[in-house]
Amino acid sequence: MKKIVKVILKLLIIIALIIGGIFAYKKYMEYLEEERIKNAIIKIDFITPLEIEYNKEIKLSDLIISINGELIDDFKIDTSIVGEKEINFKYINEENIKVPYKFKLNIVDKTQPILWLSDVYSVNVGTTKKLEELIMCGDDYDDNPTCIVTGEYDLSKIGSYNLTMEAIDFSGNKTTKDFLLKVVKPKSSSSSSTISFSYLYNQYKSDNTLIGIDVSKWQGDIDFEKIKEAGVEFVFIKLGGQNGIDGDYYIDPKFERNIEGFKSVNIPVGLYFYSYANSVSKAKEDALWVVDQIKGYEIDLPIAFDWENWSKFNSFHISFNNLTKAAGEFINTLKSNGYDGMLYSSKNYLEKIWLKNNYSTWLAHYTSNTDYEGTFKCWQRTSSAKIPGITVNTVDFDICYK
């Protein structure tokens, strides 16, 4: 028995020595590697100044003029937050040493705020809101740019006033605009001319297009059979929206009738939701509400994020970047629940407000031939179409591309 114990002890000692030796060898090799790295030749020339515009798409290699080796990973750099950012990377130098390196990158916002203001701005006499509330003033990064109107004016009296408006963002970028304020009598609304659906259909129907309409309560009780006979190939139906910022959700009074009616005549259905989201989290809430309302319905086409509160934009306290992210959150939340989403907006806002994105787009541009240069899936051509089956008001005419 004693002999067995001695043998076991010897084996344990041998094992301990082997493990200790391996550990010591590993530490020694780590030391050698640290020394190699410490003494490695590093030759890297960066762009000067090491400064990049906010939200610009760049890779690590875009910042390097020359390097004595090859990058292990030429990764994309996140430039979504203004300020100083530490960048860490590794590369194999000319001695075949894997060298870690870090540097500071300054991310800056040099884009001026936007004042949605022409040379002449008209308001109705008796308007109680301040001009700073009425005139759209926004920024790509700053949720709350400073917006000031200078000069004397009186909204309770008809007249003309020479004024200046200034917008300053978080980074000190400034936009200044001189304009003529006209305080005028309210004008009576005049009816606009209409265009027959059949004329538009013949003009825009091709092998590459589908012709449709979008509807809400404003189209009243629709005769779906007549709509089908007129040649409508798809429809976007208003599901509902929200009663202002943080207001209650509502379902369009004609939604149920419309979706069941269009389904009964086999017209493919998409939806749109009128959003008042003032944050990414609110847009997600919007999307989840939408998903909850449409359970049990088969939705054939995308569900559009319809955000067009431009006349009240200043009260939302949201940057163009965060607004664009909000649209993305709405679309991505729909996608995670099995639905396609898209962004609805007009040409001017798509070009000047919404930041670069890869969202499927429903373009609103009321013209015979759009010159919008971005990509779009559908085009809302006019809001003045007349079609058999809708006797209350006109209807929006849409073209979708196959």
What does each of the following model-derived ranges do?
Residues I67-Y101, D142-L181:
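Serine/threonine-rich, repeat-prone extracellular segments and beta-strand-based repeat modules
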Residues M1-L17:
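N-terminal Sec-pathway targeting helices
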Residues I15-Y28:
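Hydrophobic alpha-helical membrane-insertion segments, chiefly the h-region
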Residues S191-V215, K356-K402:
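Functionally critical loop-and-helix segments that line ligand-binding/catalytic clefts
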Residues L334-E351:
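Aromatic-lined carbohydrate-recognition surfaces of secreted/lumenal glycan-active proteins
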Residues L105-D109, L181-K185:
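Interdomain boundary/hinge segments at the C-termini of tandem beta-sandwich modules
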Residues K205-A230, F236-A327, K335-N337:
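Substrate-binding cleft of extracellular glycoside hydrolase catalytic domains
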Residues M29-N68, T111-D142, S189-S191:
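Solvent-exposed, low-complexity, repeat-rich "mucin-like" stalks and linkers
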